[in-house]
UniProtKB/Swiss-Prot annotation:
Family statement drawn from the similarity comment of this UniProt entry: Belongs to the RETICULATA family.
InterPro entries per record: RETICULATA-related
Presence of the UniProt keyword Membrane in the record: yes
Gene Ontology cellular component annotations, sorted alphabetically: chloroplast membrane; plastid
Keywords: Chloroplast, Developmental protein, Membrane, Plastid, Transit peptide, Transmembrane, Transmembrane helix
Name of the protein described by the UniProt record: Protein RETICULATA-RELATED 2, chloroplastic
Membrane topology classification: Multi-pass membrane protein
Gene name for this UniProt entry: RER2
Function: May play a role in leaf development.
Bias kind Gly residues: ranges: 68-86
Residue range of the transit peptide in the UniProt record, numbered on this chain: 1-58
TM regions (residue ranges): 148-168, 213-233
Region (Disordered): 68-92
Length: 339
């Protein structure tokens, strides 16, 4: 009996020596750790979301150990099917709106290396051409309406940069069609000529959606820009009481609604077409010729934009000229005298 007991004791020790004991995991060190169990009923491996991606956790219950992190099997991350870690969620920037803007800028530069050059040309050449087009559409080249021209300069500078930023493709939105809300989810997220497998209705949906966005931005920028320009004119009057503007200051709300209409219709169509043209030219032209074409296209685009805004402002009455009214009244009085 003693010999049999000794033999049994030795056999149990040899069996235990071949069993790999499970390692203990201290989950208190990482309170954000997630443990995932397979749905097939066998606990063969644990997939967690630790910072170390290659820790092996063998578990009792059969099967080999799976790896923790982005390379696990089953329902782990990387293979889909309910796992974690397939795509990292974007964290809010500690710098607030400025940090979000910097992240958005980097994302746009990553998607289009020519984006900084386009913005520079838009702000230098484009805004200047916009002001020239605005002045060319006014009597006496706008010299009698410099207050209106200044208002256009302030609002146009804000809007031109905003248009460039909103229409530029980003590294996140490049090739994506699910970034827009509601019924526009299947539409291109940047502009209607964005590369991708989109239908004609999808691209038209982007035109409509961006038009609503630009109209909203135009309304906000019109309110801010008109208030700034009118405030500066009032400040000038306080400093120099003899200063008189040749025209009445533009009504803030009416001028803002005019800008909203201009942005949602004219600017929306022009800038989306411009983005599509630049996309095609970048693929077919040498870099130097392409940059030259960018400058030329933006000059033409902004001259047309300035002229179209003056026409719309005249139609809505947001920028009425006092001298024109005086001339009309004098002509009427002269006709009455002749009669």
């Amino acid at each position: 009996m003693a010999a049999m007991a000794a033999k049994l004791h030795i056999s149990t020790k040899s069996d235990q020596s071949n069993v790999r004991l499970p390692r203990l995991i201290n989950l208190s060190r990482d309170p954000t750790a997630r443990v995932l169990f397979p749905r097939n009923g066998s606990v063969s491996s644990l997939h967690t979301n630790f910072s170390s991606p290659n820790i092996m956790v063998p578990c009792a219950g059969g099967g080999g150990g799976g790896s923790i992190g982005n390379h696990g099997g089953g329902s782990g991350s990387g293979g889909g099917g309910g796992g974690y870690g397939g795509s990292e969620e974007e964290e809010s920037s500690p710098w607030g709106p400025l940090g979000l803007f910097i992240q958005g800028w980097r994302s746009r530069v990553a998607a289009d290396s020519q984006f900084p050059f386009k913005v520079l040309m838009e702000m230098l050449v484009g805004v200047s051409a916009n002001v020239l087009g605005d002045m060319a559409s006014r009597p006496n080249f706008g010299l009698n309406e410099l207050d209106f021209v200044f208002s256009t300069l302030v609002v146009g500078s804000i809007l031109n940069f905003t248009l460039m930023y909103l229409l530029a493709p980003s590294a996140i939105s490049h090739g994506s069609s699910n970034l827009l809300p509601g019924i526009f989810r299947s539409c291109p997220s940047s502009h209607m000529f964005e590369q991708g497998n989109f239908t004609l209705m999808n691209r038209f949906g982007t035109l409509v959606y961006k038009g609503m966005v630009f109209a909203t931005v135009g309304l906000a920028a019109g309110l801010v820009g008109t208030a700034i320009s009118n405030g500066l004119i009032m400040l000038r009057k306080k400093i120099d009481p003899s200063f008189e503007t040749p025209n009445k200051p533009p009504p803030t709300l009416l001028n803002s609604l005019t800008w909203a209409t201009h942005m949602g219709v004219s600017a929306n169509v022009r800038y989306q077409t411009l983005n599509g043209a630049e996309f095609l030219l970048e693929k077919s032209l040498p870099p130097l010729v392409f940059k030259t074409s960018v400058i030329a296209l933006r000059v033409v685009n902004n001259v047309l934009g300035g002229m179209s805004f003056v026409t719309l402002a005249r139609m809505t009455g947001s920028q009425s000229v006092e001298e024109e009214k005086k001339i009309e009244m004098s002509e009427i009085s002269e006709k009455e005298k002749e009669d």
